[in-house]
A protein has these predicted regions:
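Ferredoxin-type iron-sulfur electron-transfer modules in oxidoreductases and energy-metabolism complexes
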Residues: 1, 44-167
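A basic, amphipathic helix-loop patch mediating RNA/tRNA/ribosome contacts
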Residues: 1-21
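Secreted/processed peptides and extracellular or luminal domains of membrane proteins
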Residues: 14, 19-22, 39, 114-120, ...
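Short, charged low-complexity intrinsically disordered segments located at boundaries
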Residues: 17-27, 162-167
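Glycine-rich phosphate/adenylate-binding loop and adjacent beta-alpha elements
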Residues: 20-43, 48
């Protein structure tokens, strides 16, 4: 049997990520675990590969070590501003428009498909999604600059490629 990673089987965690026919997660706009075989035609040749990035070393077959993404989040995914106890923090007023934008920014499930799809294996899209999400809420604004610097430095340390404009 071929080793592969999975967790939720609901399309919300991204652990199932592989490259199918050269496309991260395959030809549909979904995660691999939500991709159905009916997407393909009879007789189609289907090629599956692990994520391709120096920062994602292959553990076995289609399983890669994605802990580099976790370390980027850990480098800047914190809010150290004292908001009191949990009920107090939940009482911080957030305008609906800001809450909606933060919710949309949180749509990134952290699977690494953007890294796998990038010819340079850049984690800039992943990192910017996390930075944007944390910046949109008032609790994260006081330390935003430090968070961005920490996350970008960690991204560089992990060996992700640089962004370039590819036409």
């Amino acid at each position: 049997p071929i080793a592969f990673d999975s967790d939720c089987r609901e399309g919300i965690c991204g652990q199932c990520g592989i490259v199918i026919n050269g496309i991260a997660h395959g030809p549909e706009v979904t995660t691999t675990c939500q991709l159905h075989m009916r997407t393909f035609h009879d007789g189609d040749v289907i090629t599956i590969e692990p994520w391709r990035a120096e920062a994602f070393p292959i553990i076995k077959d289609l399983v890669v070590n994605r802990s580099a993404l976790d370390r980027i989040v850990q480098a800047g995914g914190y809010i150290s501003v004292n908001t009191g106890a949990a009920p107090d923090a939940n009482g911080t007023p957030v305008p609906k428009q800001d809450a909606d934008r933060a919710f949309e920014a949180a749509a990134c499930i952290g699977c690494g498909a953007c890294v796998a799809a990038c010819p340079n294996a850049s984690a800039m899209l992943f990192t910017s999604a996390k930075v944007t999400h944390l910046h949109l809420l008032p609790q994260g604004k006081p330390e935003n600059y430090r968070r961005v610097v920490n996350m970008l430095n960690q991204m560089d340390e992990e060996g992700f490629g640089s962004c370039t404009n590819i036409g």
